[in-house]
C-alpha cells in the first residue's frame, strides 16, 4: 500500500538482477480487473434499485392514467411523468429514480452528452427496458404490453460499454427481482442492443 490512505497499489514488485522493479503490465491488468469488478457490482445494485423504482412507479400511478403500469422509459418526456425520473421542485417528493439520478449527478454523470442513438452510460454500463419475456422465463413467452401500457411486467438489460474493459458480464432482471448474468463476448453491444425479451435460458446464471 502507498500514501496516507494505504491505497492498495496494483503493480506487483519483481526482483531483477539490478534490484526490485514494479511490473507495469501486471499493474495495468490489475487496474482493469478492479474497474470491471467494481462496475459489475455497481450494476447489479443499480438493477435492483430499478426494480424497486418500477414497483414504486406502478403503485403510485404518477402519470394519473388510471392504470398501475410500469414505466417504459427511464427519463420522463418533458413536462410528463411517463418515466422513472422527472425533475421536481423544492418540497416535492422525489421521482422513483430521483435518488439514483442525484447520486449519479454528484459523481459527474449526465454532464456530457450520450453517444448518438445510445443510452447514457453509468459506471461503464448501458441500460435498456425490455417489454416482453421469452419461453425460458417463468410463465413462458408473452408481451408485457397491454394496449401499449407496460402492465404485464418489465425487464431490464445492462451491458458494458466496452466489453473486457468497462465490464465483462451482461445482466438482465425482470419484475421478479432475480438478476442473471452472461458473458456475451466481443459482440456484446450488438447482442444486447438487439435484445427484445427477457429470456434467461440455461446459459444465464443467477447472481448469488
Regions found by a protein language model. Give the residues of each.
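Conserved hydrophobic/amphipathic alpha-helical signal-anchor segments
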Residues: 28-77
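Exposed beta-strand-loop-beta-strand "reactive/processing" segments of non-cytosolic proteins
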Residues: 1-12, 154-158
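Flexible, glycine-rich surface segments
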Residues: 57-165
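C-terminal soluble interaction/assembly domains
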Residues: 152-208
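Stable alpha-helical elements in mature extracytoplasmic
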Residues: 5-9, 43-46, 53, 164-167
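Acidic surface patches and DE-rich sequence motifs
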Residues: 2, 16, 174
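Short beta-strand edge/turn micro-motifs at domain boundaries
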Residues: 6-37, 178-182
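Solvent-exposed loop/turn segments at secondary-structure junctions
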Residues: 5-7, 27-30, 132-135, 161-164, ...
Amino acid at each position: 500500500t502507498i500514501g496516507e490512505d494505504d491505497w492498495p497499489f496494483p503493480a506487483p514488485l519483481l526482483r531483477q538482477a539490478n534490484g526490485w522493479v514494479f511490473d507495469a503490465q501486471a499493474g495495468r491488468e490489475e487496474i482493469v480487473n478492479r474497474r470491471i469488478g467494481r462496475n459489475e457490482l455497481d450494476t447489479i445494485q443499480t438493477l435492483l434499485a430499478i426494480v424497486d423504482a418500477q414497483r414504486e412507479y406502478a403503485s403510485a400511478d404518477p402519470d394519473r392514467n388510471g392504470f398501475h403500469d410500469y414505466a417504459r422509459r427511464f427519463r420522463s418526456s418533458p413536462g410528463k411523468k411517463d418515466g422513472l425520473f422527472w425533475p421536481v421542485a423544492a418540497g416535492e417528493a422525489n421521482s422513483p429514480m430521483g435518488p439514483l439520478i442525484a447520486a449519479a449527478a454528484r459523481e459527474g454523470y449526465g454532464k456530457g452528452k450520450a453517444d448518438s442513438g445510445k443510452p447514457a452510460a453509468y459506471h461503464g454500463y448501458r441500460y435498456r427496458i425490455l417489454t416482453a419475456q421469452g419461453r425460458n422465463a417463468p410463465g413462458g413467452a408473452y408481451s408485457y404490453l397491454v394496449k401499449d401500457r407496460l402492465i404485464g411486467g418489465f425487464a431490464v438489460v445492462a451491458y458494458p460499454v466496452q466489453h473486457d474493459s468497462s465490464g465483462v458480464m451482461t445482466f438482465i432482471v425482470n419484475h421478479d427481482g432475480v438478476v442473471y448474468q452472461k458473458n456475451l463476448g466481443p459482440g456484446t453491444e450488438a447482442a444486447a442492443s438487439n435484445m427484445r425479451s427477457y429470456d434467461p435460458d440455461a446459459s444465464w446464471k443467477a447472481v448469488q
